[in-house]
């Protein structure tokens, strides 16, 4: 009997599950000590509110992870300011007005779509998982109301596999849906007989295990455009349902799972290093230090006591102001502490602070909280900017991987979905069939470009200083190129800079106006001179009289 699709996928899932097992103990430990409610290794954990932070005494690691996620959100994909822009591969075409306006319009529509969707609620969770577990995953799906709908996956709930290029192209996700959700999403005819019986009996909120697999559709028929022959196959099925029944079999034009990794070792599928993994040892040590400090204080304030045997089974009190009566016996000290504890916690507190600093450094807290932790009022603005840029450069490699594995696929898929729904204006004719590229202009992306920005500003200032002594030095500066380069590296809107062809037209018009004004001024000067001559009295001993006499003298000589 031929193997069914569900049986084949279950076999592939078993292989992915076996491959992931070596990562799970590390992830569980990270979850226990840093992010207790950020994992889901069992589908039965859904809607469970049991306490999970029993191993955390000092929450420095948890707060550092929160700072990293918030800092990456505000520094990379902040909804409060533009963080990406579209461009053409040819830089000269970016100076063409219609192209510049079309790209700006498309970018604005994409930003509006992102703001309307739940993308900015999902990204902080993705960044948090990425920083603590070195791997994150988020689905970007089509939605009838918001165009796109994102769904972040908790660590432990998904299984990944790489393509030959080393990028993730396969994802299996095991999760739970209620009977009501299954019927609403897939229809009563597509669910198993067990779910049908639950529905008919009114058991709507019982949880059912579901598997969703997305993988390359290698055997697709490229001549067909139906959902089953798209580049990526999507299959939903019940884990415990019938072997020959699927909930839904469809496909995607683009891989819908964004799965960035903080750092990858060789051919590994999952991330191998991240701030959470670096900080795990200090986080565990910090819990022990805090426990010892509390024990030290507890022994000093509530010490163990020794007493004579005569007090056995007698009333003894340790309450403030209370009295315990004993008979003083020679050679005995009476009711007293077993040993005296000197609660000198200075060294312990210093060790705790040092451990906290290590944790914060691992999570780049000093980078994101730099302006708060440093007194910048007494520092020049240039020094503050330079210090901030230097700190942000530390995240350069992480940003490049995040762009490649998350943000680029996110923008490509969102753009393609808008094209399929005819939500974009028609492009100019010169852009027909031209690919687009994405440039990032977030705070952190601009920090990577700030070195070139500072160099450009320094060069222009240097030429300006030379021009004060030698004005011809300005001939060496291409002002138009300097303005375009500065605006490009600053990330300002393209509509702020006037296209080059409009600049040339304005300059020609200005030159023509100046030429006309000069000709008019010369004509007015000539007319004014003629008028002055015509109004002058020749009888006066003036220049005209002298001229008349000279003319008459010449006439007499000629006669």
Across the structure, where does each feature detected by a protein language model lie?
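Short, Φ-rich (hydrophobic/aromatic) sequence segments
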Residues: 60-76, 110, 114, 121-131, ...
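Charged, amphipathic alpha-helical segments
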Residues: 113-122, 209-221, 465-469
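Structured, contiguous alpha/beta core segments that scaffold functional sites
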Residues: 14, 142-320
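Alpha-helix initiation and N-capping motif
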Residues: 103, 107, 120-123, 135, ...
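C-terminal anchoring/interaction modules
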Residues: 1-34, 39-43, 302-559
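Short amphipathic alpha-helical segments
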Residues: 98, 102, 106, 118, ...
């Amino acid at each position: 009997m031929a193997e069914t699709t569900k049986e084949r996928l279950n076999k592939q899932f078993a292989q992915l599950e076996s491959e992931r097992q070596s990562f799970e103990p590390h992830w569980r430990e990270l979850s226990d000590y840093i992010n207790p409610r950020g994992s889901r290794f069992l589908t039965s954990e859904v809607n469970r509110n049991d306490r999970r932070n029993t191993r955390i005494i000092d929450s420095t690691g948890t707060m550092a992870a929160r700072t990293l996620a918030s800092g990456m959100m505000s520094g990379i994909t902040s909804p409060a300011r533009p963080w990406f822009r579209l461009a053409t591969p040819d830089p000269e075409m970016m100076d063409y007005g219609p192209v510049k306006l079309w790209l700006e319009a498309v970018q604005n529509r994409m930003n509006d779509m992102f703001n309307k969707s739940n993308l900015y609620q999902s990204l902080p969770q993705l960044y948090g998982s990425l920083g603590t577990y070195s791997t994150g995953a988020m689905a970007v799906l089509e939605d009838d109301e918001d165009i796109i709908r994102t769904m972040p996956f908790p660590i432990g709930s998904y299984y990944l596999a790489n393509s030959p290029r080393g990028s993730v192209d396969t994802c299996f996700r095991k999760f739970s849906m209620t009977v009501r959700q299954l019927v609403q999403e897939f229809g009563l005819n597509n669910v198993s007989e067990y779910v049908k019986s639950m529905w008919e009996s009114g058991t709507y909120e019982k949880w059912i295990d579901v598997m969703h697999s997305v993988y390359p559709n290698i055997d697709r028929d490229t001549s067909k455009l139906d959902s089953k022959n798209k580049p990526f196959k999507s299959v939903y099925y019940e884990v415990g349902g019938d072997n020959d029944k699927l909930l839904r079999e469809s496909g995607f034009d683009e891989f819908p799972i964004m799965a960035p990794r903080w750092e990858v070792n060789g051919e590994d599928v999952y991330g191998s290093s991240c701030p959470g993994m670096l900080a795990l040892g200090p986080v565990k040590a910090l819990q022990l230090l805090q426990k010892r400090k509390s024990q030290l204080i507890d022994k000093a304030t509530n010490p163990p006591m020794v007493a004579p045997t005569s007090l056995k089974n007698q009333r003894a009190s340790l309450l403030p102001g209370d009295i315990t009566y004993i008979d003083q016996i020679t050679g005995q000290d009476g009711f007293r502490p077993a040993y005296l504890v000197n609660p000198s916690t200075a060294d312990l507190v210093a060790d705790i602070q040092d451990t906290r600093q290590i944790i914060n450094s691992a999570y780049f807290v000093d980078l994101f909280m730099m302006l708060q932790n440093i007194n910048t009022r007494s520092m020049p603005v240039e020094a503050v900017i330079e210090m901030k840029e230097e700190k942000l450069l530390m995240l350069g490699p992480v940003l490049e991987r995040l762009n490649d594995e998350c943000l680029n696929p996110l923008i490509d898929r969102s753009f393609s979905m808008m094209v399929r729904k005819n939500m974009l204006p028609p492009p100019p004719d010169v852009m027909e069939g031209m690919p687009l590229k994405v440039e990032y202009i977030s705070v952190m992306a601009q920090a990577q470009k700030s070195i070139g920005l500072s160099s450009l500003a320094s060069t222009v200032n240097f030429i300006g200083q030379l021009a004060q002594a030698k004005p011809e030095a300005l001939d060496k500066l291409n002002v138009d190129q300097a303005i375009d380069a500065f605006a490009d590296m600053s990330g300002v809107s393209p509509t702020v800079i006037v296209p080059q062809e409009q600049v040339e037209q304005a300059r020609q018009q200005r030159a023509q106006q100046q030429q006309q004004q000069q000709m008019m001024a010369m004509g007015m000067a000539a007319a004014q001179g003629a008028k002055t001559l015509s109004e002058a009295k020749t009888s006066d001993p003036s220049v005209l009289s002298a001229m008349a006499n000279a003319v008459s003298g010449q006439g007499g000589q000629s006669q």
